[in-house]
């Protein structure tokens, strides 16, 4: 049961494509804070099932991801955003 040598963890038969690093949309806009009442902006960072998108998918920086998470949770608590969708 030996593995092929020289593969270096890559998928067989394909060329590795390096993806471009995502830029935080809030840093680009120079947003001072993320408003929990801005539902249209918050909906971009929530899946259709109601889960908050992680940083690696949304492309936000750590500071704005923390702020975004608390804004989404605050909007959920006052029923601006749903907890889940069915």
Curated annotation (Swiss-Prot):
InterPro entries: Ribosomal_bS18 (IPR001648), Ribosomal_bS18_CS (IPR018275), Ribosomal_bS18_sf (IPR036870)
Function: Binds as a heterodimer with protein bS6 to the central domain of the 16S rRNA, where it helps stabilize the platform of the 30S subunit.
GO biological process, one term: translation
Annotated organism of origin: Clostridium beijerinckii (strain ATCC 51743 / NCIMB 8052) (Clostridium acetobutylicum)
Disulfide bonding pattern of the chain: none
Keyword RNA-binding: yes
Assembly: Part of the 30S ribosomal subunit. Forms a tight heterodimer with protein bS6.
Lineage: Bacteria, Bacillati, Bacillota, Clostridia, Eubacteriales
Stretches for region Disordered: 1-20
Coiled-coil stretches: none
GO cellular component, one term: cytosolic small ribosomal subunit
Protein name, per record: Small ribosomal subunit protein bS18
A GO MF label: small ribosomal subunit rRNA binding
Key words, A-Z: Ribonucleoprotein, Ribosomal protein, RNA-binding, rRNA-binding
Family: Belongs to the bacterial ribosomal protein bS18 family.
Record keyword Ribonucleoprotein present: yes
Gene3D superfamilies, per the entry: Ribosomal protein S18 (4.10.640.10)
């Amino acid at each position: 049961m030996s593995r092929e040598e020289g593969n270096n963890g890559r998928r067989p038969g394909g060329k590795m494509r390096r993806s471009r690093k995502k830029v935080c949309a809030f840093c680009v806009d120079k947003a001072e804070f993320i408003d929990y009442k801005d539902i249209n902006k918050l909906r971009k960072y929530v899946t259709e099932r109601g889960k908050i998108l992680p940083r690696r998918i949304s492309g936000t920086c750590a500071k704005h991801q923390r702020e975004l998470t608390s804004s989404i949770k605050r909007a959920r608590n006052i029923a601006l955003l749903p907890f889940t969708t069915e």
